[in-house]
Amino acid sequence: MARMIQCAKLGKEAEGLDFPPLPGELGKRIYESVSKEAWQGWLKQQTMLINENRLNMADPRARQYLMKQTEKYFFGDGADQASGYVPPTEG
């Protein structure tokens, strides 16, 4: 049976992650209160940030920036938006 949690990002009960996605305290916090659905949303956001900002993930400063953005996305006022991103329009 799937592990259900109250998702901090989506504000609803949803299926939780199978394991902590990151090491340390932030990974534990995400595991305990972020759903699979919300995590998938973050992976898309993270990819846009890496691409738009041309982040080199071998650079410790880039990794530190992404960790801060991860925490802001789930538990703060939202992560930075990719500067060149224009949401698709319906129609």
UniProtKB/Swiss-Prot annotation:
One of its GO terms (molecular function) is iron ion binding. Gene3D superfamilies: Fe(II) trafficking protein YggX. Keywords: Iron. The keyword Iron applies. It comes from the Bacteria. One of its GO terms (biological process) is cellular response to oxidative stress. Pfam families: Iron_traffic (PF04362). GO terms for cellular component: cytosol. Could be a mediator in iron transactions between iron acquisition and iron-requiring processes, such as synthesis and/or repair of Fe-S clusters in biosynthetic enzymes. NCBIfam families: PRK05408.1. Belongs to the Fe(2+)-trafficking protein family. This is Probable Fe(2+)-trafficking protein. It comes from Burkholderia cenocepacia (strain HI2424).
